[in-house]
Every structure is written in C-alpha cells, then in structure tokens.
Amino acid sequence: FLDLPTDCPQRDERLGWTGDAQVFAGTACWLADSQSFLRKFLRDVMADQRKDGAIPHFSPDPTRLHPMSDPTRPDQLARSGDWAGSTGWGDAIIIIPWQLYLHYGDKGVLAECFPAMLKWLDYLWNISDGPLIRPSSRWGSHGFTFGDWLQPVGDNRKPRPTISDECA
C-alpha cells in the first residue's frame, strides 16, 4: 500500500488492481488500520464506475483520463472500455465495503457504496444468461475477462482434471 493497492512492483503492474484489493482487504484490515486507505480507494472505484455499472479492473483508472486510442500498438493493450466488468475485479465494490464493516463496524461505508453495489449487480444481471453469469462460447463477447487460471475457450460442460485437483 502506498497511495493505492498495487499488484506487484517488480512487473510494472503498479496500478490499483481492484481484484487484488478485494482479495487482500480483509487481511489488510487485520494487519493494520486500513479503514481510511480502503475508503479512499472505494471512492476512486466509484468515480471510475462505468455508466453501465461495470467496475474497472484498476482504479484510479488512467484510461478514463487518457484513453488508449490505438489497440494495435504493443503499449496499448486494449481500448479503455475493455478494462472493466470482470467478475472478481468488479466484486471489489461489494467485498471491500463488507470487509470494512466486519472489521470496523463501519455501516457508513455500506451506505455510501450501496448505489454503486446495485449498479454493479445490475450490470452482472444484464450480461448474465438467465440466473447464471457464464462465459459465452466466444471469448470476450460479454466484455473482457481475465480467466487467469481457467481455459477461456472450449467445451466447459465436461470437467477435466487440472494440476491443482489433488491439492484440495
């Protein structure tokens, strides 16, 4: 933590990745008084929330102020609108306020974030297939998703063994 929750400084990923922040929020609150820091981060996330309710993958979102105009250039990996709306990363708007409530009894953060939470849930409902949020058969047809540990394409109806199966 410096001014924002970063991913890993050694790989030039010093953006405020929302997925990393939501995973670490509970631990951060347990290790140190992180209430003010995380509330400030949530305000950044709410300021960056898209009109359709999508939560950005990182916040403050530099693409909001300086859109990446040429996705074919190696230094511009995607159009700015593509960097929002992935589950896990967007869930930060719900998980971080909840962690602040659990650790500090802060009901104010729940009230402050509630409209953004509803917008995020509406966004998820709008991209869902009925009651389930599923990746579609085409990679990225519902917007960009990371799927860091999952195969993004293929027959997802048949479970296949993975290297981590025996770890559970």
Where are each of the predicted segments found?
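Conserved, well-structured interaction surfaces
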Residues: 75-82
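Short, solvent-exposed loop/beta-turn-alpha elements that line the ligand-binding surface or hinge
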Residues: 99
